[in-house]
């Protein structure tokens, strides 16, 4: 690790803290690479594509999951030297919490918009967050080297949709490096310097922006200093948890780790302090000095609440301990992922996990399978329902299999979301029908050029299943979608159980709206009929709500030709053999176990292929 002694007296006027706000794929990480390269943050040979996207899965999917940070040294055209702290934020809705905490550490943002595609739904969501944080915005139009780029039309669109002046937008191509110096000048000249109400003489007050686990150094904490100075050897206190630690190392990321003596007001850097788990560091917490604490903490952050739950089970029961260890390791780096043990009659031991959303679920599952070489089955995702019981108490339901007797429940409330969908108007009809089918309530429909912007209220339960995939297929991939949780509302919800040969299969039970139950039940039964192999006896597959069966399919029995050995035409002899076979099958149906293959589970849970 390089050693760099920096005097902590960088004047506030020469520091710029900024983040880059963009929709997935609009070139945010590539722009970050170019800024690092242009300011000499890494030598040419150390540059890799998307330097800040450390996980393989981030590079492959081309998305940023964990917020990363980098400190750049830049000599401006006016001859002055500046320190630029870039916090690279994720663009996807599931990681909105990572975005919000990154934004609160900065004073300004670069709004990156693809000059050929224009404003997308997530651009909007993140821009509004930046505006809520009182950020100064510099608009950057990327990919202007593409033949399809229309900078003038997109500038108008930005002014129309977002309502900010885009006349001075910087035109760049992050891929070729065109216009990057203009971006650096705009950061210095148009974004504000950080403010420090108390200056460097005040008691230490710092915002905990992020934390991650390093195999050699333990937990590393990313901090933004508001007041005071943070130095090595200091005893610090987390104001939220009241935990005390001694600072062992102070440094900055360039993006390599570089040790420094201290961090002063306005600066962003990292510390290590023998912290055992990432869970001990609550993001958004205020760090202060133990001996001379600051009077009041920074306005509080909420811990991330899991929104979607699903069971993860190892395909091979022997992998259970490996799965537990792997989840523990992922939890070290992702405080918003939660899990607890659960057992299922059909799938054995596994974990009930909580996620921020569907992409988060997919990424955790993919990381477990890829980085830890595990084979997993995920049960149908479900959301958190609030149950108001007849005795006046209130309970949360995370797993449909745990639902108490219906008689004890007076009403069930489900979470609703406010969704914003941007789509070319050719696909509007199909999307309106999709939202209608999913019990959506239309709030607003506006046109921006040839694109429609839809605002809908939807039950989250209808979205977690396959809404996003259906939206993409209806719009040929052109529609973009973003949502925020709004509230819980009462719903006519029922628990649908799937019975195979009269036995309920807990892993397939789900909460559905009463109006959609019959169709969902029929689809599920038909799918299982195709997937479960024939046995020596008939197998009924039923979907039931309480005691009422709402759909049924029957898998016919395999037949052995017991009359093959009868040569003569004696009918009574044949009858006797057939009756004997019938009695055997009846007995078998009572005691026979139906083996449901793993593929059947996996396919039945991917009901989105309808």
From Swiss-Prot:
Entry keyword Glycoprotein: no
Family named by the database record: Belongs to the TRAFAC class translation factor GTPase superfamily. Classic translation factor GTPase family. LepA subfamily.
Lipid metabolism as UniProt keyword: no
Any Pfam family the entry gives: GTP_EFTU
Enzyme Commission no: 3.6.5.n1
Any one of the GO CC terms: plasma membrane
Matching NCBIfam families: lepA, small_GTP
Species: Rhizobium leguminosarum bv. trifolii (strain WSM2304)
Principal location: membrane
Entry binding sites for GTP: 25-30, 142-145
InterPro entries recorded: EF-4, EFG_III/V, EFG_V-like, EFTu-like_2, G_TR_CS, LepA_C_sf, LepA_CTD, LepA_IV
Keywords: Cell inner membrane, Cell membrane, GTP-binding, Hydrolase, Membrane, Nucleotide-binding, Protein biosynthesis
Catalysed reaction equations from the record: GTP + H2O = GDP + phosphate + H(+)
Recorded GO MF terms: GTP binding; GTPase activity; guanosine tetraphosphate binding; ribosome binding; translation elongation factor activity
Subcellular location per the Swiss-Prot or TrEMBL entry: Cell inner membrane
Purpose: Required for accurate and efficient protein synthesis under certain stress conditions. May act as a fidelity factor of the translation reaction, by catalyzing a one-codon backward translocation of tRNAs on improperly translocated ribosomes. Back-translocation proceeds from a post-translocation (POST) complex to a pre-translocation (PRE) complex, thus giving elongation factor G a second chance to translocate the tRNAs correctly. Binds to ribosomes in a GTP-dependent manner.
Protein name as annotated: Elongation factor 4
UniProt domain tr-type G: residue ranges: 13-195
Primary enzyme class: hydrolase
Membrane topology type: Peripheral membrane protein
Gene Ontology terms describing biological process: positive regulation of translation
Segments forming a coiled coil: none
């Amino acid at each position: 690790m390089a050693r760099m002694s920096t005097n902590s007296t960088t004047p506030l006027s020469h520091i710029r803290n900024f983040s880059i706000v963009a929709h997935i794929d609009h070139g945010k990480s590539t722009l970050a690479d170019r800024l690092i390269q242009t300011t000499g943050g890494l030598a040419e040979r150390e540059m890799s594509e998307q330097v800040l996207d450390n996980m393989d899965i981030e590079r492959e999917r081309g998305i940023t999951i964990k917020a990363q940070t980098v400190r750049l040294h830049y000599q401006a055209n006016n001859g002055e030297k500046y320190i630029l702290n870039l916090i690279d934020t994720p663009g996807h809705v599931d990681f909105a919490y990572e975005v919000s905490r990154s934004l609160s550490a900065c004073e300004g943002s670069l709004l990156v918009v693809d000059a050929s595609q224009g404003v997308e739904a997530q651009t909007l969501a993140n821009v509004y967050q930046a505006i809520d944080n009182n950020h100064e915005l510099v608009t950057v139009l990327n990919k202007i080297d593409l033949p399809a780029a229309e900078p003038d039309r997109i500038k108008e669109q930005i002014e129309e949709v977002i309502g900010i002046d885009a006349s001075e937008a910087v035109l760049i191509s992050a891929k070729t490096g065109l216009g990057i110096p203009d971006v650096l000048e705009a950061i210095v000249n148009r974004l504000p310097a950080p403010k420090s109400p108390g200056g460097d003489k005040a008691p230490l007050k710092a915002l905990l922006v992020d934390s991650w686990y390093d195999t050699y150094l333990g937990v590393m904490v990313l901090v933004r200093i508001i007041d005071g100075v943070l130095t090595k050897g200091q005893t610090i206190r987390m104001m939220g948890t009241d935990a005390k630690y001694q600072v062992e190392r102070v440094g900055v990321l360039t993006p390599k780790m570089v040790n420094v003596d201290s961090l002063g007001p306005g600066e962003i850097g990292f510390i290590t302090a023998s912290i055992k788990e990432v869970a001990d560091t609550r993001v958004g917490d205020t760090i202060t000095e133990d001996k001379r604490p600051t009077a009041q903490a920074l306005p509080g952050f909420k811990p991330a609440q899991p929104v979607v739950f699903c069971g993860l089970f190892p395909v091979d029961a022997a992998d259970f301990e490996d799965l537990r260890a792997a989840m523990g390791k992922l939890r070290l780096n992702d405080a918003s992922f939660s899990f607890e043990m659960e057992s299922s009659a059909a799938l054995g031991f596994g974990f009930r996990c909580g996620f921020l959303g569907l992409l988060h679920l997919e990424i955790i599952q993919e990381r477990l399978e890829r980085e830890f070489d595990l084979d997993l089955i995920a049960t149908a995702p479900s959301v958190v329902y609030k149950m108001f019981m007849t005795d006046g108490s209130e309970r949360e339901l995370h797993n449909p299999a745990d639902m108490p007797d219906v008689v004890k429940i007076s009403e069930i409330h489900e979470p609703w979301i406010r969704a914003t969908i941007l789509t070319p108007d050719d696909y509007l009809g199909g999307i309106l029908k999709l939202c209608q089918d999913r019990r959506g309530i239309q709030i607003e429909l506006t046109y921006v050029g040839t694109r429609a912007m839809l605002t809908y209220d939807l039950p989250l339960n209808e979205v977690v299943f396959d809404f996003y995939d259906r939206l993409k297929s209806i719009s040929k991939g052109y529609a973009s979608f973003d949502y925020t949780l709004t509230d819980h509302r009462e719903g006519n919800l029922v628990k649908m159980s799937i019975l195979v040969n009269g036995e309920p299969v807990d892993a397939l039970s789900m909460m559905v709206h009463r109006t959609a139950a019959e169709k969902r039940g029929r689809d599920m039964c038909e799918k299982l009929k195709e997937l479960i192999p024939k046995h020596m006896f008939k197998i009924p597959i039923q979907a039931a709500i309480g005691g009422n069966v709402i759909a049924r399919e029957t898998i016919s029995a395999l037949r052995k030709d017991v009359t093959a050995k009868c040569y003569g035409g004696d009918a009574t002899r044949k009858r006797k053999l057939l009756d004997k076979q019938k009695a055997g099958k009846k007995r078998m149906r009572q005691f026979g176990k139906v083996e449901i293959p793993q593929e059947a589970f996996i396919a039945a849970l991917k009901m989105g292929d309808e």
